[in-house]
Amino acid sequence: MKENIQSKEDLLDWIEALEYQLLFNGRNDTKLFAKEFIEHLNNKGLIDELTSNMPFENSISKDEESDYPGNWHIEEKIRHYIRWNALITVLKANKTLDLGGHISTYSSAATLYEVGFNHFFRGGNLSDMVYFQGHSSPGIYARSFLEGSISKQNLDNFRQEIDGKGLSSYPHPWLMPDYWQFPTVSMGLGPIMAIYQAHIMKYLEQRGLLQNEPNRKIWMFCGDGEMDEPESMGAISLAAREKLDNLIFVINCNLQRLDGPVRGNSRIITELGAIFKAAGWNVVNTIWGRKWDDLLAKDSTGALKWVMNNTVDGEYQNFKAKGGAYTRKHFFGKHPEALKLVE
């Protein structure tokens, strides 16, 4: 089909008008405008299907971010200590007794947990409830060691509980009643229990049977592989239907999938985001770290965002493993304008 020059000019006019709207009225008003416009097109029968896929970008842009409430550099140093202690805990247990244990789960989620511990989780009599991803337990123990609530002897006896001075492999309130609050292994138990915990608390609160702190939250930390378990997403529609605004899922998409290979070749973040969004959840993507901010600010053509949205998980794993030169060629090299950003 021949290119329609007039249609192309009209399209550019529409895009220019949208950019004007964004510049002078802001993101929120522009989102509302776009939503109503798309709904109008849909009502006219001009859109066959609406995608629920979110862009492979951070949901909160740089100019919308709040100032970080802590000292990032000090917190980063503490994270390094915790990661190291978690690593050594597992390695020592394997060196002599071949007991197993998980290293990469906590290593990839350390920032998520530390931001939570330092700035979100609240203690006290009516504290927040946290369902920790089971395989991340070495990191939680390592943090407690820095705080002084777990001894070196405890860490040395990871997965060695017979003498009474060890640490359970995973969150286990029966074996460690003064430490763990909820069991989250086998995989899939944590997500569905968190949903029903939030549900019963909301039920009791609305009937005056439970006095809660304002904004008391139930946090559920899990991995992308765990979301394959039928229990993990089996009740997510209930959470939306019952308006459980006291529930937060944090899904660490580290692409490891300990219990099996990936089942497709796209982006698991995009897939899960679409599923939760379609079920009625508010979905927030946190994908790109602050070191990408300068590059994204220079991306006036949108080429870098195009590359991000046209790269699949398997490629991202390659980029992480094969270094800068490979990434420059095969990631930024997908678009000439993106490549110019790193020349």
Language-model-detected regions and their locations in the chain:
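Long, compositionally biased, glycine/small-hydrophobic-enriched stretches that function as flexible linkers
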Residues: 33, 39-42, 48-53, 188-190, ...
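Short acidic/glycine-rich loops and adjacent helix/strand connectors
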Residues: 15, 146, 270-274
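Terminal amphipathic helices with adjacent charged low-complexity linkers/tails
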Residues: 36-60, 133, 286, 290-297, ...
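Cofactor-binding active-site loop characterized by glycine-rich and histidine/acidic residues
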Residues: 64-82, 86-96, 102-242
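Short internal beta-strands
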Residues: 130-133, 246-254
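Long, well-ordered, tryptophan-enriched scaffold segments
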Residues: 5, 253-343
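Conserved alpha/beta enzyme-core scaffolds, especially Rossmann-like or related mixed alpha/beta domains
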Residues: 98, 103-106, 212, 221, ...
